[in-house]
UniProtKB/Swiss-Prot annotation:
Annotated protein name in UniProt: Large ribosomal subunit protein uL30
The family this protein is said to belong to: Belongs to the universal ribosomal protein uL30 family.
Lineage: Archaea, Thermoproteota, Thermoprotei, Sulfolobales, Sulfolobaceae
Encoding gene (name): rpl30
Source organism of the structure: Saccharolobus islandicus (strain L.S.2.15 / Lassen #1)
Listed GO MF terms: RNA binding; structural constituent of ribosome
Gene3D superfamilies from the UniProt entry: 1.10.15.30, Ribosomal protein L30, ferredoxin-like fold domain
Length: 158
């Protein structure tokens, strides 16, 4: 079973060094409140450590991932994702099995560009951020690694 990381960009590009912007481009996080899902690998973790003042990340659970797919993921044409679309395009029964296959590592969301609009766009969090986006999460801020608390933030941003 693959651990999926949910990564959200929380700061803009102004005054960011070129290597930060370049790494965020590689992660496909071009704008504020964009999110992507990647498997937890040493390469991804290295990139996240490099850009940690601009993103927050953590392990996403299957329920939040399913909700994210249903509410915010769009098809290549801009429509909402449905069971019929997933069955037609990916040859997968429904969204539940798609989530299961994402966690088993059989399919990767970041490699499905031709079927979905990626990255996934989110709203700003309802109620605002609880801390400053200029401080790390462990010091009552918002950026950096936050573990399974990413699910709570994503639900507030859908």
């Amino acid at each position: 079973m693959v651990e999926l990381l949910g990564i959200i960009r929380i700061r803009g590009w102004a005054k960011a060094p070129w290597y930060i912007n370049e790494t965020l481009e590689m992660l496909r996080l071009r704008y504020n409140f964009n999110t992507m899902m990647y498997p937890k690998t040493s390469q991804i973790l290295g990139m996240l450590n490099k850009v940690s003042p601009y993103v927050t990340w953590g392990e996403i659970d299957p329920d939040t991932l399913k909700l994210l797919i249903i509410k915010r993921l769009e098809t290549a044409k801009g429509d909402k994702v449905s069971d019929s679309y997933v069955k037609e395009v990916l040859k997968i029964e429904n969204i539940d099995t798609m989530v299961k296959q994402l966690y088993e590592g059989k399919i990767y969301l970041h490699k499905l560009d031709q079927y979905f609009k990626l990255p996934i766009r989110l709203h700003p969090p309802k109620g605002g951020f609880k801390g400053s986006v200029k401080r790390p999460y462990k010091n009552k801020g918002e950026f950096g690694y936050r573990g399974d608390k990413i699910n709570e933030l994503m639900r507030r941003m859908m």
